[in-house]
Regions:
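As written
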Residues: 47-48
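Contiguous mid-protein beta-loop-alpha structural module that forms a pocket-lining wall or clamp
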Residues: 56
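Non-catalytic positions within long, well-ordered alpha-helices that form the structural scaffold/packing
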Residues: 43-44, 175
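Active-site pocket-lining/capping segments in soluble small-molecule metabolic enzymes
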Residues: 1-33, 52, 60-181, 187-244
Length: 244
């Protein structure tokens, strides 16, 4: 009863296409396909019917991809914010020795440590200090690209702050440009997290489908999403903001 298989490995795609031609194949975000030429290649070679875009594309770029491929396009709507091209980030592998493409996550739970010190709550990844939070600050999950580091004698978030991607306000626009599905991050998340976020997004999508022109984000939705947002902060990520 499986609806589709999500794959990133070309060898597995070829095997699935040959041995199970009736099976619907989706290209994983780990396939790092950021343009329509790459997506069309996977479609022509392996029959991919849907592709999940990495979280580094702006809205005009997403629209350009949608217009130039017969493949359904899926984008991330809520969850962790990855500022790298998924499948190609070497930061976490450098610190933990585990590649995101082989272990499935960029900060494996086994490498994560929280320690209360006199200076504040410290978060470490494989022993490396990633951040230190004051009592008044919300403690984020230790991800290397969201660490607070000393650069030119200043300590700050050099790449990105601990925050969650939330594109709820973009729903009408995503529908308008032809995006076919919204992806909610579930990897390293609890069933309760997935249920809570999915419930909010189901209500929002149904509301937008009924009346896209007058769609507005409800306070109750944001209140629920705030409970599971990293650092209680939201961002539109690359959709409407260039990286530093």
């Amino acid at each position: 009863g499986v609806d589709a298989i999500i794959l990133a490995d070309p060898g597995l795609m070829e095997y699935a296409k040959t041995k199970h031609p009736q099976l619907r194949l989706h290209l994983s975000v780990q396939g790092s396909a950021t343009n329509y030429e790459a997506i069309n290649f996977y479609h022509e070679q392996f029959g991919i019917q849907r592709a999940v875009l990495p979280r580094v594309l702006a809205m005009p770029q997403i629209e350009h991809v949608v217009k130039n491929t017969p493949v359904e396009i899926e984008v991330f709507g809520f969850g962790g914010l990855c500022v790298m091209v998924e499948g190609r980030c070497a930061l976490s592998a450098y610190v933990t020795g585990d590649s995101p493409n082989t272990v499935g996550v960029c900060s494996p739970g086994k490498a994560v440590r929280y320690e209360q010190t006199a200076q504040g709550m410290e978060t470490r990844l494989n022993g490396v200090l990633i951040d230190r939070f004051a009592e008044s600050e919300k403690t984020g999950y230790p991800t290397l690209c969201k660490g607070r580091f000393e650069v030119n004698d200043e300590t700050y978030y050099a790449i990105e702050e601990p925050t969650s991607l939330n594109t709820l306000e973009l729903l009408p626009k995503l529908m308008e440009i032809g995006v076919k599905a919204i992806k909610i991050e579930g990897r390293q998340r609890s069933p309760a997290y997935v249920a809570q976020v999915t419930k909010v997004w189901r209500e929002a999508i149904d509301s937008a489908l009924r009346n896209r022109q007058n769609f507005s984000v409800r306070e109750a939705w944001m209140a629920e999403l705030n409970k599971v947002s990293e650092g209680n902060m939201h961002t539109l990520g690359a959709y409407y903001r260039p990286w530093k």
